[in-house]
């Protein structure tokens, strides 16, 4: 058994993790003769030998702001003594209950689950918290809460310092210092240690995070220490990228324009991308469409996240792969190329493009080829189907590989507009557009980050990353100046 632990860092990341584990839960009720997946890879089994039953909890460590868990208490389903509503008849007689914030009522969906009743239909208004629709019971050690930062339902991705509406968790350096100063020792010695004890042979981690705000600095600091502690494991980083002046420029075909707020956003993005991509074996820059809520984003991205991870837990040993295999396959012999630049879900009726780099304005090239044609360094197709795929034998040429895995089984918590058919193909590509992004980032640092101590280190790191994705000849004057 080769377990995978998911570490989700931010409210938005927790929505994706929740949708993923809800999909894992639906597979537990698969009544077919041959199970398609091994639940123990992503879920931790607890065996009750008296009742001869098995219960499962996610192999997960969730980070969120205070009250970000909604109505869910850490010990709500294991020990009720820390969790009260207005009726406190069972509270300890030797102490007083201190209420530090208004009680968040349990969602109708959770009440229905507890009572064994039909669940109500989900929408944006009743899914403000990821816990509103979580179907599995998490271990208390899965929950990690920022002590001084509070969740704000009006701005859920940027916690509020002590709920004073005065300071936001919106800078890379704030998140980085927050982890290093307050959580480094406690996290590794307690909750992470407990999660590791539940694993027999851990193969790696999925790190899900935001990078436009303080969570990018927080997850970067966490991953650096995690990699130092467990250097032999494999790390996949899933980084949510919000819309910014680059994506606006791409969409509207206009010049890139920055103000103070968006320049800070890009600075956060660059620092988090540099750190996470260096420490990860694969870095997946997911685009977070501002038109969707966090619940909808989790629903939209789940086929991508679930699809790649389905390769890791299939019961068919001929089709199952591990995280190291996937990372080496997509790096294709060069461990400096760790970034997935394109990830498309392909069905008969449509194609969904999941990644941020596909929405980035393109620099000019000396080559006479069309600027949209990027050189492909490696490509992996993951075909999902519950039927035997005779025509899709695994391809083993240098740049294009194909992997077959079992079909997608979405949970009822997925938004109706994103409930996909079980059969589809994921196309993951590492190509030359990464150079385009990092050259633009380098131009940004040169123009807008003038006095930071790490300025030269950032420029060198960005230049080195860009050079890893070069192919052919470029103009000496090749830069993104014309976009500004």
UniProtKB/Swiss-Prot annotation:
PANTHER family: MITOCHONDRIAL DISTRIBUTION REGULATOR MISATO, PROTEIN MISATO HOMOLOG 1. Keywords: Mitochondrion. Transmembrane segments: none annotated. One of its GO terms (biological process) is mitochondrial genome maintenance. Its main location: mitochondrion. It is found in: Mitochondrion. GO terms for cellular component: mitochondrion. The keyword Mitochondrion applies. Pfam families: Misat_Tub_SegII, Tubulin_3. This is Protein DML1. InterPro entries: DML1/Misato, DML1/Misato_tubulin, Misato_II_tubulin-like, Tubulin/FtsZ_GTPase_sf. Belongs to the misato family. The keyword Manganese does not apply. Involved in the partitioning of the mitochondrial organelle and mitochondrial DNA (mtDNA) inheritance.
